[in-house]
């Protein structure tokens, strides 16, 4: 029986469990060319989310993913709902747009050390737990208008190169 080799991506001792993509040493999520894999990436991401839902998982680990774009608007991420609550995006690169409009996050969300090449949109979101955008590079506009941060919101050491819109955002706990 031939076993497919796993992705070569490593982060703080974590080994990516996904199979290699085409002739790359990386999986579809860590493959360096976002344009080349766009359709495969979206289908694989939807399958990963569905798999985590069916397992009853409480988190989705997307550390180091190289996103062509991501659209997860109007979703509720909750351990008691259908989508896993905790989202881990550390060190990911977003080459396309990032859209989470009207989403509700019941657990931690971690975007630390991410690079955003295109606009990011988190309008009218609710973060019930800590959210981290530490040490990020945001190269385009970002919109957090009307977003509610119920716990700690950290943007420390983040570089904003475009307009950062926090109009009508509510910070109920510590913001840095």
Segments (PLM) and residue ranges:
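N-terminal leader/targeting and pre-domain segments
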Residues: 1-176
């Amino acid at each position: 029986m031939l076993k497919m080799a796993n992705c070569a991506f490593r982060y703080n001792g974590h080994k990516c469990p996904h199979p290699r993509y085409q002739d790359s040493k990386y999986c579809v999520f860590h493959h360096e060319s976002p344009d080349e894999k766009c359709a495969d990436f979206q289908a694989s991401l939807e399958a990963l989310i569905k798999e985590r839902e069916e397992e009853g998982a409480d988190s989705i680990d997307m550390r180091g993913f190289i996103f062509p774009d991501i659209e997860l608007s109007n979703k509720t991420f909750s351990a008691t709902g259908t989508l896993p609550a905790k989202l881990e995006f550390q060190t990911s690169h977003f080459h396309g747009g990032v859209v989470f409009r009207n989403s509700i996050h019941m657990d931690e969300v971690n975007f630390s050390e991410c690079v955003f090449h295109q606009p990011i949109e988190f309008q009218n979101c609710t973060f019930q737990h800590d959210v981290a955008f530490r040490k990020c590079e945001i190269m385009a506009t970002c919109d957090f208008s009307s977003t509610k941060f119920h716990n700690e919101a950290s943007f420390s050491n983040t570089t904003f190169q475009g307009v950062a819109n926090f109009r009508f955002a509510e910070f109920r706990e510590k913001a840095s």
